[in-house]
Amino acid sequence: MRGMNTTLMQMTVLMLCGAGWRVLTPNRLSADQTRLVLTSVVYYFFMPVMVLDVLWRADIGWQSLQYSALGSISILLSILATWMLAKLFRFKNPQTGAVILAAAFPNVTYLGLPVLEQIFGDWTRSLVIQIDLFAEAPLVYTLGIMLARHYGATGEPKPKSVLAFFNAPPFWAAFVAVVLNLNQLPIPFWLAGLLQKCSGAVAPLMIFSLGLALSWRDIRVRNLPFIAPTALIKLWLMPLIALWLASLLNLTGQPRTAAVMDLAMPSMVMGIVLCDRYKLDSGLYAMAVTVTTALSLVSLPLWYRVL
């Protein structure tokens, strides 16, 4: 438990450094400009390198299907629960779309990866990447966009083919890594060292970027009726669903604990992009990210103790 608290304290300090950048704007670089650069570097270079490094070595098999099923079903059931709640309280469309995205899609990589890696070790990189690339990301780029379009402004241009969303560096890296893995091709010694060094840059850049995305200016009293159920579903109901599913899927030990905790992470940052593009309530979503991230500093240690 002490290790968990120490890890979260370290993550919090690094996030606060990112949040401090928003206030100080060194060299007149705004937080949004800096975050765009950092997240682009991670997405187009460091993340694919880490995906290649991890999945090339990973034990891909039945457990990969377990992770995929656990992540996918947990997200789908959370979407259903949030939709029912939005219907019950008669949320308007822009708020409904934002709340569904915030409650159902966890920050499995940008926060989950560094937290789980620090607590359980490097082996969790494989777990996080498989939940992200084989469960959450496909749902974000398909069902997530469909929901955003449905609840957002009308008149949006026809979306690209679903396959076009997967024409991205992390997915290509995953494809190459899985092919190399299944063909049992060894990683050259010189390349292994390079991949590991580059992979080490991902976690601190992710945490700092997350801090850049947080803004207390987005906190609005009028949004509290939407934020309370969002946080309840994201930080408590979804992990309960994941815990129940993990038992059905025969996941045990540390893999079960790490997988459930990954799905207990706060709202993903990327959802703000979908809210902006499809005219959902972006302010509400930004507040959900800030509040659930802050509350996760309490909920994650509790889940760690329970699991």
Task: Describe the role of every protein-language-model region.
Residues 1-307:
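Alpha-helical transmembrane segments of multi-pass small-molecule/ion transporters
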